[in-house]
């Protein structure tokens, strides 16, 4: 996926708050929603009553969840449980049949993916999304050209991101020459160039050597210390449970359980249906 397409043609990053911007889309006729809006805390990304069917088969039914700024939340479950569909409905890649997605209490359900990105919902796909024909600094700079019109501030922000993610030494390197861990750091740094309030990470441990797992975990923790809310879906359960604050376990298209990692692992139902009786953190 070309990440610039998430912002739309000739798009610029919104400088007002997500709530104010969502409201402006409503005024322009691009935003629709129910007359009744439930109370939702500022600084949250939430889904309510999501449902999705394919060919008459209901794969997601009445799933609700929330992520607050500064916390990491896992979206986990067995293959075919519906977790990926839920995740893609939140990103905007899949349209929900029922339910809604709210950012800071404002309905963003009808918005395409690029508008959600402009409001502050970042997305890092499972497959490599790096621009292979560009250098590291040009990868990050491509997004900064959209989000920061001032050339001097753009250069300063580029230097800061390279330093923050410890990739200054490869700034001139072609992206195709990076290791798996370096590539992930570049992708996350580039995602942060869009100044998201929330990051949705799809299989962040996929294609990563075991030695780099701790590096990715540290990067996710770094995002939360920045005040960014993180939603992760991944098949590497142990690694994911080792870094999140809470998790939602999806089974047969519904939320089987929500809780902290210790509560999840201790649940007889979760162990029986998903983790197995011998699972340990």
UniProtKB/Swiss-Prot annotation:
GO biological process: transmembrane transport
The ABC transporter domain, residue ranges: 45-277
Pfam families: ABC_tran (PF00005)
Positions with a binding annotation for ATP: 77-84
GO cellular component, one term: ATP-binding cassette (ABC) transporter complex
Molecular function GO labels: ATP binding; ATP hydrolysis activity
Keyword Nucleotide-binding in annotation: yes
InterPro entries named in the record: AAA+_ATPase, ABC_AA/LPS_Transport, ABC_transporter-like_ATP-bd, ABC_transporter-like_CS, LPS_export_LptB, P-loop_NTPase
Region (Disordered): 1-38
Keywords: ATP-binding, Nucleotide-binding, Transport
UniProt superkingdom: Bacteria
Similarity comment: Belongs to the ABC transporter superfamily.
Protein name: Probable ABC transporter ATP-binding protein AZC_3926
Organism field: Azorhizobium caulinodans (strain ATCC 43989 / DSM 5975 / JCM 20966 / LMG 6465 / NBRC 14845 / NCIMB 13405 / ORS 571)
Lineage of origin: Bacteria, Pseudomonadati, Pseudomonadota, Alphaproteobacteria, Hyphomicrobiales
């Amino acid at each position: 996926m070309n990440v610039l397409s998430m912002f739309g043609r000739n798009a610029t990053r919104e400088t007002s708050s997500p709530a104010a911007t969502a409201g402006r889309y409503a005024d322009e006729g691009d935003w629709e929603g129910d007359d009744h809006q439930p109370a939702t805390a500022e600084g949250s990304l939430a889904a309510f009553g999501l449902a999705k069917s394919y060919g008459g088969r209901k794969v997601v039914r009445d799933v609700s969840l929330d992520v607050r700024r500064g916390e990491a939340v896992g979206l986990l479950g067995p293959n075919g449980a519906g977790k990926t569909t839920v995740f893609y409905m939140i990103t905007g890649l899949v349209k929900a049949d029922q339910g809604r997605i709210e950012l800071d209490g404002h309905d963003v359900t009808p918005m395409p993916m690029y508008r959600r990105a402009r409001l502050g919902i970042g997305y890092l796909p499972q497959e490599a999304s790096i621009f292979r024909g560009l250098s590291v600094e040009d990868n990050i700079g491509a997004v900064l050209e959209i989000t920061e019109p001032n050339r001097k501030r753009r250069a300063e922000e580029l230097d800061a991101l390279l330093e923050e993610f410890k990739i200054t030494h490869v700034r001139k390197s072609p992206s195709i020459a990076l290791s798996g861990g370096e590539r992930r750091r570049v992708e996350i740094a580039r995602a942060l160039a869009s100044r998201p309030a929330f990051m949705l990470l799809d299989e962040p441990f996929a294609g990563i050597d075991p030695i780099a797992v701790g590096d990715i975990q540290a990067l996710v923790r770094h995002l939360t210390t920045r005040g960014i809310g993180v939603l992760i879906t991944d098949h590497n359960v142990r690694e994911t449970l080792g870094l999140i604050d809470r998790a939602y376990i999806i089974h047969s298209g519904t939320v089987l359980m929500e809780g902290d990692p210790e509560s999840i692992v201790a649940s007889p139902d979760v162990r029986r249906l998903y983790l197995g009786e011998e699972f340990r953190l």
